[in-house]
Amino acid sequence: MSDYLVAALYKFVSLPNYESLREPLIDFCQSREIKGTLLLAAEGINGTVAGTPEAIQALLEELRRQPGLDALEHKESVATEQPFYRLKIKLKKEIVTMGVEGIDPNLVVGTYVAPAEWNALISDPDVTVIDTRNDYEYEIGTFRGAVNPNTQSFRQLPQYVAENLDPNKHKKVAMFCTGGIRCEKSTALMKQMGFEEVYHLQGGILKYLEEVPEGNSLWDGECFVFDNRVSVKHGLEEGSYELCHGCRFPINETDKQSDKYIKGVACPRCYDEQTPEQRSRFLERQKQMELASRKGELHIGDRADIAKSRTTQGAPSADGE
């Protein structure tokens, strides 16, 4: 089959009847073999989906026909294999979970900065640059000079801001995330807390990697994505990272050279934390996956097993939280 089209999308907009969208969208996507995750809430829609180019374009057109979603924006990339195992369309309280009441990006948000103008902003010594993503995302790539809040989930960012940033000291703050959605809420939070000059990267890291040539880039490393590609590089090409099936954290070639790496079972991060029972279960799961692979079958049960048996706090969530 030809390459799959991957579409990352979100829109903060009032969707009072969001619950009624779920079943029709499930039917629409299943009939076109679209896979991925869509989150629906009263505050809008968020998700990443993949399928044939024709199927994804049809879905985007269908979404834009819904009241309030006519201006829905999305970012596209390509995957050589279907990057999702299944389709999930969820009803949520928030489309990206911060856990702070009263934050509405439709009312107030930071100043958008286009990728072409981002380098100049973050090169300003008076600007504090904050990576709003989680620790494991920061580890594999970030912008030069960016601060790592050391969060394990987006819910922890408000506490970091309250304890480490001061409107009287940090006059200019620039924030960025994968696709832009977390910055919508984080900059809205900052504005509510009294920070006056707050900026965020329009379209997120993905748009920057798509538009800014590598030779001019201030991005170091790769960008974690919440699908089976694991990471992408400049030009949105598939990256070099894989997921450890024991803890769901990204691993590279150096990790795989470790004595504590067991394919499909453990990596240096989680090896010492696994119980004998977990190790045995993971080994059996890997055996079944390899058998399915040799038969040309897709072993999709592993993701459910992994989700139940995470051994490390803060493992990546498919929802990007």
Swiss-Prot record:
Spans annotated as Disordered: 294-321
* MF annotations from Gene Ontology: oxidoreductase activity, acting on paired donors, with incorporation or reduction of molecular oxygen
Record EC number? 1.14.-.-
InterPro entries in UniProt: Rhodanese-like_dom, Rhodanese-like_dom_sf, TrhO, TRHO_N
The protein's UniProt keywords, in alphabetical order, are:
Oxidoreductase, tRNA processing
Domain (Rhodanese): residue spans on this chain: 123-217
Which reaction(s) does its UniProt entry say it catalyses? uridine(34) in tRNA + AH2 + O2 = 5-hydroxyuridine(34) in tRNA + A + H2O
Q: What class of enzyme is it?
A: oxidoreductase
Q: Which CDD domains match?
A: RHOD_YceA
Question: Is tRNA processing given among the entry's keywords?
Answer: yes
- For bias kind Basic and acidic residues, which ranges apply? 294-308
- Entry's HAMAP family? TrhO (MF_00469)
Q: What does this protein do?
A: Catalyzes oxygen-dependent 5-hydroxyuridine (ho5U) modification at position 34 in tRNAs.
Q: What is this protein called?
A: tRNA uridine(34) hydroxylase
**Gene name, Swiss-Prot/TrEMBL:** trhO
